[in-house]
Amino acid sequence: MVNLRGYNWKSQQLLLFLIIVAAWEAGSGQLHYSVPEEAKHGTFVGRIAQDLGLELTELVPRLFRVASKDRGDLLEVNLQNGILFVNSRIDREELCGRSAECSIHLEVIVDRPLQVFHVEVEVKDINDNPPMFPATQKALFILESRLLDSRFPLEGASDADVGSNALLTYRLSTNEHFSLDVPPNHEQVKPLGLVLRKPLDREEAAEIRLLLTATDGGKPELTGTVQLLITVLDVNDNAPVFDRSLYTVKLPENVPNGTLVIKVNASDLDEGVNGDVMYSFSSDVSSDIKSKFHMDTVSGEITVIGIIDFEESKAYKIPLEARDKGFPQLPGHCTILVEVVDANDNAPQLTVSSLSLPVSEDSQPGRVVTLISVFDRDSGANGQVTCSLTPHIPFKLVSTFKNYYSLVLDSALDRETIANYDVIVTARDGGSPSLWATASVSVEVADVNDNAPLFAQPEYTVFVKENNPPGAHIFTVSAMDADAQENALVSYSLVERRVGERLLSSYVSVHAESGKVFALQPLDHEELELLQFQVSARDAGVPALGSNVTLQVFVLDENDNAPTLLGPLANGVGGTMNEVVSRALVPGQVVAKVRAVDEDSGYNAWLSFELQPVAGGVRSPFRVGLYTGEISTTRALEETDALRQCLLVLVKDHGEPSLTATATVLLSLVDSGQTQKVSSKVSAGASRVDQRLVDVNVYLIIAICAVSSLLVLTLLLYTALRCSATPTDGACAPGKPMLVCSSAVGSWSYSQQRRQRVCSGEGPPKTDLMAFSPSLPQGPSSTDNPRQPNPDWRYSASLRAGMHSSVHLEEAGILRAGPGGPDQQWPTVSSATPEPEAGEVSPPVGAGVNSNSWTFKYGPGNPKQSGPGELPDKFIIPGSPAIISIRQEPANNQIDKSDFITFGKKEETKKKKKKKKGNKTQEKKEKGNSTTDNSDQ
């Protein structure tokens, strides 16, 4: 029963131990021990293995070891019994100084598994340090004349221990003259001191020795002592006295070294050495005063030895001391007040504070740009500063308060005129001479989008040959924007409109960045002679600004159309016609006529006719007019001539390369009687055809009248709308191309500056209708005014077909065939010209056209040149077979006007088809009348 109880008790004890260990480990895992300082080697500290719950047998296998953050040799663990003991001397004052808490921190490390335990060992203080005075002996000199209760400070003792071991108490050896004044422990300001309780008498006791003892609060108590040696001094009854207690001196700044400031004097009523006075600065004088002033100890003179600067110090207060040579020395005191007088030796200082830079160019006047502060270290008028600005700038200074100015905007800014202002601010003080300083403020003007892109000119004229490849670069527009950065980033676009039935963008495009204009498809001069459109340039600003430029693209003709034969010949480049010719014709009689037209213009539409030679070298009795296409006899027809004459007429233009068409003309030679029979049959057939044509023409006339009326009304309405609209809409814009034409009197310049504006609305521009005011070069100066040509030039629209070719010119009643050969006369508007002076007349079309320079040269010959100041009597219109005569009228009859002259506009395809149908009937009539008809009806 006893054993069971003992077993249960042991089990409970073990369980309690395990619970404690678990609770210990669940805590911080730390052990706390304490040990007094100066403990001997081997002093027991604690059973660390047991307290950590480690078996003694595990210490070595698990590599039990102790590490210390402090000195690691102070404590050690016995691995045999698991006891922590003192290994070496522990000095708390050496380890922790005067700290109230002192501990040694250990880390216990075991392996398998690895565990770390923290152990804190508190080192307790013991009273092992006695109080210590700074010296073992202290000497004091006290005048015998000192009053009672005079206090003489003493330096106390110190104890290296802490806590109660460092609490000190003092006691003074017994005497009748002095008592000890000990302040409470919490008062650290008032030192330990001796208090005079009884007057001193040097003749009774010249020297007094006292012992001061300090005792700490430890157990046992430790003490420290100091020997006080008090010497009683004889009395020097009179101290030196200055004339005044305060001297005031004014000293200019920047005076040279050696300048006398003042000479002081002090007197002593004593005699002997007690009356001899020595001067000096007081002991509390600053080192700054000593570096600037020197005191003569004998004479009492104060001189300057350093730099006196008013801005550094406006006044110096110098305490002086005069001592006699008695024992003890008695001092006398006075004060020297040196007032420094300011000199204008400091220039103003400017400080610029940037607030809102850069400044937007649309800023309103009054906006504050920068704050400027000024400061002058001088005083009075020398420190009064005024500021001014660079003249002729849009800024001004506004004084906000003392020594502060605001740089404000005074007028409007324009970055495109001046992008940056270097504002010079000048500050000037009121001294004499005046000092000044400057500061530069760089004001950058920030850009706003206030400038639209601008083209170099409002209109460009571009000449492009037809049949260009798709995507061909035809022109480059460029606009300049005076703004900066994204406000100057220009993009280009087309101003879209309709050109006929199609959009402008189907013809051309413009590159948004480079401004290059490209033709998207081959251009056809016969379809579109002038393409007028606008290109818009817009910048990338917000809001975006833009402008437009007008491009007039003239499509230059190329020889891409062969001559086309007109009825009764078949359409195309070849055809056959039959004619009956009487053998009784006289030489030069016109028997037939080949009609042809070329859809090109200029030289490319100038047609010539050639008769191909007959096979076998037989000379044909017929010839063909070079430019008229008229077939006429060269001699009288003979019986030997073949009854059927087959003539091959080659029609070719003057393009490069030349294109041709061939007409076959079959002539049947008959006698005069047979000719009348054939003619009557032809006339009868023609009359029936004419009757049918008359009926058709009536309907055509009615239809044409109706369409014309509708067209006139439409044009009137359109003209009214266009007059009320802006002139830049559609295709109406002034152009400035210069056309230079060569004539018999030299070069003629046709300026478009006075050209009448031709508006084509939203449809394709009909650029063949152009008006020029002829400008002739000035002749030599003369008193007589040279006669000017009448600018009333009119060319009938009925001759438009003749502007492309030399077809059927006899219909105008102008051309006459001479009996003598191929010489021809080209018609003018007013009358037929006489025989040319020599050779063939100049081509009636714009011969010699240079597509690059647009210089027209008429006539291959060298005609007679007109004299200076004279005007040509005729010239040739490009694309026209006519020579225009200029009527010389008196000066008072001149009318300042310009009319339209057509430049080779082709007939529309539908009109040509109708004309071909009408020409078939007309040719039938001509076959019967060819023997007698020498001119066009």
Curated annotation (Swiss-Prot):
Cystine pairings recorded for this chain: 96-102
Sites carrying sugar chains: 223, 225, 257, 265, 438, 478, 548
Region listing for 5 X 4 AA repeats of P-X-X-P, in residue ranges: 774-881
Start-end of each PXXP repeat: 774-777, 786-789, 819-822, 860-863, 878-881
Subunit structure: Forms homodimers in trans (molecules expressed by two different cells). Forms promiscuous heterodimers in cis (at the plasma membrane of the same cell) with other protocadherins.
GO biological process: cell-cell recognition; homophilic cell adhesion via plasma membrane adhesion molecules
Keywords, sorted A to Z: Calcium, Cell adhesion, Cell membrane, Disulfide bond, Glycoprotein, Membrane, Metal-binding, Repeat, Signal, Transmembrane, Transmembrane helix
SMART domains: CA (SM00112)
Membrane topology classification: Single-pass type I membrane protein
Organism listed in the record: Mus musculus
Segment forming the signal sequence: 1-29
Protein's job: Calcium-dependent cell-adhesion protein involved in cells self-recognition and non-self discrimination. Thereby, it is involved in the establishment and maintenance of specific neuronal connections in the brain.
Subcellular locations according to the entry: Cell membrane
Membrane-side (Extracellular) residue stretches: 30-697
Residue ranges, compositional bias (Polar residues): 775-787
Entry note about domains: Cadherin 1 to cadherin 4 domains mediate homophilic trans-interaction, the interaction with an identical protocadherin expressed by a neighboring cell. This is a head-to-tail interaction, the cadherin 1 domain interacting with the cadherin 4 domain and the cadherin 2 domain interacting the cadherin 3 domain of the other protocadherin. The cadherin 6 domain mediates promiscuous interactions with protocadherins on the same cell membrane. Each cadherin domain binds three calcium ions.
Protein name in UniProt: Protocadherin alpha-7
Membrane-spanning segments: 698-718
Domain Cadherin: 34-133, 157-242, 243-350, 351-455, 456-565, 587-682
Ranges annotated as biased composition (Basic and acidic residues): 896-910
